[in-house]
């Protein structure tokens, strides 16, 4: 089984039927046997992006389903991971990466993902 990192963009497109990339992401998610790796920071950022009342119930249900999905490896928060992400964030002023992006990059490196 191949492991792939799922970022906020992926989840926003998956959960928002009006997103221009929804169909492509939904098709991939529905047919892939890949192990999905993500972080609680990504899930929080996804929930923030879809916090409007019309999305809230579906997003909450989806986030809860991620907890027990055997095809999902959910990386928990830790002080060490946060500090490593913050170090990357602070050190790359030439980029417009969010802190969540930087934490994701650290996880992708640790997990040897693309």
Regions flagged by a language model, labelled:
Residues 1-38, 51-64:
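Short, well-structured N-terminal submotif of metal-dependent ribonuclease cores
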Residues 12, 50, 70-71, 89-93:
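Short amphipathic alpha-helical interaction patches enriched in hydrophobic/aromatic residues
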Residues 35-37, 70-73:
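Short loop->beta-strand "edge-of-pocket" segments that line small-molecule binding or catalytic clefts
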Residues 48-51, 109:
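Short glycine/serine- and small hydrophobic-enriched flexible loop segments
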């Amino acid at each position: 089984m191949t492991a792939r990192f799922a970022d906020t963009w992926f989840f926003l497109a998956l959960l928002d039927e009006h997103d221009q990339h929804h169909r492509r992401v939904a098709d991939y998610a529905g047919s892939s046997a890949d192990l999905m790796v993500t972080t609680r920071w990504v899930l929080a950022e996804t929930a923030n992006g879809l916090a409007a009342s019309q999305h809230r119930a579906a997003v909450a249900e989806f986030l809860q389903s991620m907890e027990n999905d055997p095809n999902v490896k959910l990386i928990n928060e830790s002080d060490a991971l946060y500090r490593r992400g913050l170090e990357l964030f602070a050190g790359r002023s030439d980029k417009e990466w969010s802190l969540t992006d930087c934490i994701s990059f650290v996880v992708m490196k640790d997990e040897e993902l693309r």
